[in-house]
Amino acid sequence: MAGEERPERIVVSVRLRPVNAREAERGDGSDWECAGPTTLTFRGAVPERAMFPASYSYDRVFSHECGTRQVYDEGARQVAMSVLSGINASIFAYGQTSSGKTYTMVGITEYSMSDIYDYIEKHPEREFILKFSAMEIYNEAVRDLLSSDATPLRLLDDPEKGTVVEKLTEETLRDKGHLLELLAVCEAQRQIGETAMNEASSRSHQILRMTVESSAKQFLGKGNSSTLIACVNFVDLAGSERASQTASAGMRLKEGSHINRSLLTLGKVIRQLSKGRNGHIPYRDSKLTRILQSSLGGNARTAIICTMSPAHCHIEQSRNTLLFANCAKDVVTNAQVNVVMSDKALVKHLQREIARLENELKFPASASCTSHAEILREKDELIKNLEEQLKELMEQKDTVQSQLDNFRKVASDGDINNHLARRWSRSSDSIPRIVSEGAFSSSDTQDIDYQDQTMDELSVPHSFPPSSQISDITEEHEAQRVAHRAESEPPEEHCKEVQCIETNKLRSRRSQEFFQTPEKKTHTDDQKHSESMSNSAENAIKLYACDFEPSFDLEKPETEESLALKRCVVSSRDSALTRSRSCRASFMVIPNSWFDDSASTTPSSETFRYSTRRPEKVRKSLSPDEIADKSTGNAEEDKSTCNAEEETAVNDIGCVTEVKQKTEMNHAPQSSEQHQPKIAKEVATVSLSKWHIDFERKQQEIIELWHDCNVSIVHRTYFFLLFKGDQTDSIYMEVEHRRLSFIKNSLIADGELHATTASSLRNLRHERDMLYRQMVRKLHLAEKERLYGKWGIDMSTKQRRLQLSRRIWTQTGMDHVRESAALVAKLVEHLEKGQAIREMFGLSFSFKPRRSFSWVGVYSRD
């Protein structure tokens, strides 16, 4: 069992030997010197374009004046002593032939063994078991140095221990003297030969391995019942050599070639490890690297001592040694404490592991939380989300409370109430009185949008302006009110849902409830009847424009003027869209430009009104037939409908104009009533022709936006075939046009057009491939030939189906669009037409907005 990993780098040291007698006789001086404890410098002149540096830095640099004891203490002792802590260790000696590798390793091995035994003597509380083994790699054959048998040994792969040497002798050490005897045997068994550069040159790689196993002598508790086991390797590598320098031949030449081959593999492994563990590491190309695999880049602490000759004749070999050292110092190893658990401790550990796995099986959700840190992170995210929700709710509460306080302040102002009472007292007895806050029923208050009112908004003018002036005043008033709400509301309030259309039954029921109010006493005045009629109507409409729902007290029979005023108010309520729970879409402000008439008397207003409490009810548009019917049926009572605008809501100012005209027309001749149906029909005809022109223009713009935004082919086909010009399609056409325009503009502004275009083109290619496959199943041979001729595809060409699929929906001409839609609808099972499908499909086009401040600007402009 291994403990926690300790990533660290290989400790690299460089040792310079002095110039020997043979080199001194040739007159070779020293080209290298130690500039400091960690820096080695080249003495000679370095060319300007040299491929090698002039100085090198390592963990430690030793000059020829430093002894082996100093080399061991400062470069290898810490690594060697880590074996007593249960960490594997390896010490290498690398360099060219005759550079002093064996001389260095003999001293380091003796010093390490001596320190290990000194440590054992100082810690009698623990029991140590030391085992020793030795091997050499001669001509790529592994031999046991503790055995007289020269038979090569095989290398085996163990899943737990890694690469092991089969039948390798392992001696249990009795004492330090026993160890020295075994070291002498190894020295005698090792292959040594004479060359031109060295009289006693090592011809093989020697590996001395000591395994240290320690455990407590007394049972100190269940937590201290484990055993530490680790090994330390002392590796004396054979030196690299050149045949021209060593003057080797025959057996020496063969030995040199094997040595150089194994050292070349070692250099490749070190170089690959220094770059990271991404590529293939050729451990198995040499037996040396295969045996020392864990020591080079695995579970071990490693120290490499590079020995080199300072003589000028060995300058190239010295640079190669330093290059190897540069790569070695970048290698990272993962040293671990090797712990062997006792049987009792192992059983307990396995029991805990079984309990943990059973708990994960019982509670799968807890399996993902593998640590306390992950649990805390999840809790922090949950707390953060709850805090954000709480903050939003508090902001909504404060906004509603502020609006409610303003409403109460306005409603409780005695001067305003008295002023309104005096104004209503001048009106006709037949005009219903608009009651104050106390007259609102519980059912009516559900649809009230509390608005911030000022004294100027509640003030009533003393003169009645013309209808054109009323239109201008109302437009300015609506613009100011929307701008004020856009500033006071948070951005999140703009992202509310559009309310859908409910049934006529619900609207008629609400209109009936509107008039079912308790009777109360009204203040009447018989004088100045016609003047008070205009002022009272103006007061009623101004209060209703502020989103207060009035209730009427009827004490006297209703006159014709009062009935007209009621119809005006009820028409405004009935035309509003109530909220539906069945369909939801993202909030988008739809303009009523498609329903605008050319009449200059019709005031412009917003289709959607913002509310800090909830979205305002959307006004329902009236079709030309409905306008004609209402004009025909109510010709005697409603003579101002010929100038009414086909908008999504019945305009409030239109009601004022209607009431005023009603009052004036009471004293006029009744001969003009017979012309009303004819005028209404003319208005409907003009509006219908204008609608078709707007529809064709809007449809062409949408087709071009489809082409620019690379919209799905199936989406284009469904939309084109579903919405063919009916006036009820106006809202869907406007939503689609705004959605595409917003996507195009926002992507260009954000700088994401390139990536999004690539994704859209890829999706279009997949759709065309789908159509290409559908042609085999949906089209007959004769039909395909007819389509090829129709689309201009030569019958002698290849892949005609693929050509046809690539030409669909590639142009914006209406003829091309119709043919493409018809073909796609035939290849793809088209949805059945129907009102429900049209509405649900149209509402699904709305684009989900991002909650950012850029949306506020979009809403404010609409």
UniProtKB/Swiss-Prot annotation:
One Gene Ontology cellular component: microtubule
SUPFAM superfamilies, A to Z: P-loop containing nucleoside triphosphate hydrolases (SSF52540)
Source species, domain of life: Eukaryota
Source organism: Oryza sativa subsp. japonica (Rice)
GO biological process, one term: microtubule-based movement
Binding site for ATP: 95-102
InterPro entries: Kinesin-like_fam, Kinesin_motor_dom, Kinesin_motor_dom_sf, NACK_C, P-loop_NTPase
UniProt feature coiled coil, ranges: 340-415
Protein name: Kinesin-like protein KIN-7J
Kinesin motor domain mapped to chain residues: 9-331
Gene3D superfamilies: Kinesin motor domain
GO molecular function: ATP binding; microtubule binding; microtubule motor activity
Bias (Polar residues): 598-610
Nucleotide-binding as UniProt keyword: yes
Family: Belongs to the TRAFAC class myosin-kinesin ATPase superfamily. Kinesin family. KIN-7 subfamily.
